[in-house]
Amino acid sequence: EDKTLGLFHGKLGACIYFYVSSNYDEDSLAYQTAKELLVQIVQKVSSVKSIDFDNGVMGLSLGLSFLMKNNYVEDTSISWLSRMDNYVYKVAVKTLDMDIKDNDFLYQVDILVYEVIRYNELKDNYKKELCLRLIKALFNQIYLNRPVNFFSEAIPFTIHDRLISFLFVLLEIRRLGICVPRIDRIFKEMKMFLFSLVPILNPNRYSLYLVSSLVAQVTDDIEWMQYVERLKKSVDMEGLFTKDMYDMSILPINGISGMVLLMFLYNRYSNNSISIDLERVEDRLESSLFWKRFQNDVSFMKKYYSLNGYCGIR
């Protein structure tokens, strides 16, 4: 029995999968399985000390919030969300006074992503104001204290990349009307560092192209537009979902499923949309040796059963 509770690699990811699969049928095996998993999670959630998305408090909070918003569970978990918010807030405030090492920089970007998501969900004006102040402090600190290799590609490919995540979350903060002049100034300053980057890996060119295109659209900056065109020409869309990833690379965080998620996110906010042959993508997913290994390798199954694995792909 897996003792991990987390969103991407633990029980909460599986819990969400079974609730969604149940189609709200309370008599179904999927619903009952989800309900049992939720009981196990709630019993142990207070013991979680890490705050990351994978297996920590931020992932648990967002997962429980999703279940409540979609009426899979009652709002009785609201007290847990409040406690989790308070815990993350305290940790986040501490990081503002810390000298963040290069390897931990994504950790701070993740906190910013979490706070922006929660800002959209919070109803309490006092908590919303605290969250807003933290968002302003965090994004400025991240930008001003970024490491020298911040404008570089992630190898191997992952959608959970600090540069891509930071650009996406800046766009969302701007969309909310928060510090728009400051963010536009950051986008302008970024040009001298970012525009020399054309990633080696095709999936990295694709993800940078998507987020840069959104920046170009909101800023209406001709230089951003030119950079986007250069990236677009360098992306092999034909081979992106079929040839660029090795057979097992179908996971949501660092595989084909993740690239599809990025496309949906882009289409949601963009003035134009990208379309791919989803049937070909589905064939590619189904033909992967991932499924055979998942059935035959117990250690592999335990590692990849949750949202960044079986449940997320399904």
Tell what function each PLM region has.
Residues E1-R314:
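Glycan-recognition and catalytic cores of secretory/periplasmic carbohydrate-active enzymes
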